[in-house]
Amino acid sequence: MNIHLDKYGQGMPLVLFHGWGFDSQIWQPIIPYLKPKYQIILVDLPGFGLTPMMDWESFKKNLLDQLPDKFALAGWSMGGLYATRLAIEEPARVQYLINITSSPRFISDVDWPGVAEEVFVNFYNNLSKDINKTLKEFISLQLNKMKFDFKIGNPPSPEGLAFGLEILGTWDFREQLKQISIPTVYLFGRLDPITPAKTMAIMEKNYPNFKYVLFNRAAHMPFLSHTDLFITMMDEFIK
């Protein structure tokens, strides 16, 4: 069972995991900026884009069979949970970990900032009614009304959306994250309504060996709203 990949450029392999509700095409606007330095590998996660539904173990095995021996790995939002889990379980393969407006746990807890689970449930309900309209509205909010023409090529399957919702609600890597010794960076947007910027202060205390970057004027999609700053950060981090 193959994972759908798109590859661009040559150089250090950089694998990109998209967020919930989207597919790998969300990365297209930044490919021209990354292509001169990296071999970009876009991945459709299970139930999204052209990748069929499968559980974590099947996804991991099939994906690793298709990837180079070593690679840098970046995950946006839900993709950050996938990226973090892969880095924890396969430290010999993942050389760098970049988490973009993501955290080891998405749902708020007594001592952990996050979002209420209802936020994702409401988003799920809206996606089920009109996916392109919902995603366009979401992007518009995150980019502060900046014009961005996005149309999803292959709508996510209902199973993919439901599985993603389960991941966002249940995956929690706060303890396992302490095992990670590879270079790791977390990027936050000060205006992000989904991964609160105050998460950064708690993470800096709990995981002092990681690097942290705060985009002062960004929300949940700094790679699109502040592409130049994002590319500069990537180039400085991946040596």
From Swiss-Prot:
It catalyses: 6-carboxyhexanoyl-[ACP] methyl ester + H2O = 6-carboxyhexanoyl-[ACP] + methanol + H(+). The physiological role of BioH is to remove the methyl group introduced by BioC when the pimeloyl moiety is complete. It allows to synthesize pimeloyl-ACP via the fatty acid synthetic pathway through the hydrolysis of the ester bonds of pimeloyl-ACP esters. It comes from Legionella pneumophila (strain Corby). Pathway: Cofactor biosynthesis; biotin biosynthesis. Its EC number is 3.1.1.85. This is Pimeloyl-[acyl-carrier protein] methyl ester esterase. InterPro entries: AB_hydrolase_1, AB_hydrolase_fold, AB_hydrolase_sf, BioH. The gene is bioH. Its main location: cytoplasm. The active site is at residues 77, 192, 220. GO terms for biological process: biotin biosynthetic process. Monomer. It is an enzyme of class 3 (hydrolase). Belongs to the AB hydrolase superfamily. Carboxylesterase BioH family. It comes from the Bacteria. One of its GO terms (cellular component) is cytoplasm. GO terms for molecular function: pimelyl-[acyl-carrier protein] methyl ester esterase activity.
